[in-house]
Amino acid sequence: MPRSLKKGPFIDLHLLKKVEKAMEAGDKKPIKTWSRRSMIIPNMIGLTIAVHNGRQHVPVFVTDEMIGHKLGEFSPTRTYRGHAADKKAKKR
C-alpha cells in the first residue's frame, strides 16, 4: 500500500542535506548512500546518487521520470544468471 499523500515523501535527513549541499555547490560527484528507502524528489534531478545494493554502490543518474520512486528500485540486489541448461539438448 502506498504512503499517504498527507504525510509527504520520505527521505532520510542525512541524504537530503547531501543533496541540498550538492545542488547549491553545483557538484556533479556521485553522492554515496545506503538509504534505499528514500523517495526521489525533484531536488535530485540531474544528480548521480550511488545506491548501495548490499555489495557495492550502483550509480543512478536521476531523471524526471524517476520522481516518486524509491532509490532502491534502481539498484538491483540479486543477480540472475539463468536457469541450468540441459546438457543432453546441447549435444544434439
Curated annotation (Swiss-Prot):
<dbReference type="GO" id="GO:0000028">
    <property type="term" value="P:ribosomal small subunit assembly"/>
</dbReference>
<dbReference type="GO" id="GO:0003735">
    <property type="term" value="F:structural constituent of ribosome"/>
</dbReference>
<keyword id="KW-0689">Ribosomal protein</keyword>
<protein>
    <recommendedName>
        <fullName>Small ribosomal subunit protein uS19</fullName>
    </recommendedName>
</protein>
<comment type="similarity">
    <text>Belongs to the universal ribosomal protein uS19 family.</text>
</comment>
<dbReference type="InterPro" id="IPR020934">
    <property type="entry name" value="Ribosomal_uS19_CS"/>
</dbReference>
<keyword id="KW-0687">Ribonucleoprotein</keyword>
<dbReference type="GO" id="GO:0006412">
    <property type="term" value="P:translation"/>
</dbReference>
<dbReference type="Pfam" id="PF00203">
    <property type="entry name" value="Ribosomal_S19"/>
</dbReference>
<dbReference type="InterPro" id="IPR005732">
    <property type="entry name" value="Ribosomal_uS19_bac-type"/>
</dbReference>
<keyword id="KW-0699">rRNA-binding</keyword>
<dbReference type="InterPro" id="IPR023575">
    <property type="entry name" value="Ribosomal_uS19_SF"/>
</dbReference>
<dbReference type="GO" id="GO:0019843">
    <property type="term" value="F:rRNA binding"/>
</dbReference>
<dbReference type="GO" id="GO:0005737">
    <property type="term" value="C:cytoplasm"/>
</dbReference>
<comment type="function">
    <text>Protein S19 forms a complex with S13 that binds strongly to the 16S ribosomal RNA.</text>
</comment>
<dbReference type="InterPro" id="IPR002222">
    <property type="entry name" value="Ribosomal_uS19"/>
</dbReference>
<dbReference type="GO" id="GO:0015935">
    <property type="term" value="C:small ribosomal subunit"/>
</dbReference>
<keyword id="KW-0694">RNA-binding</keyword>
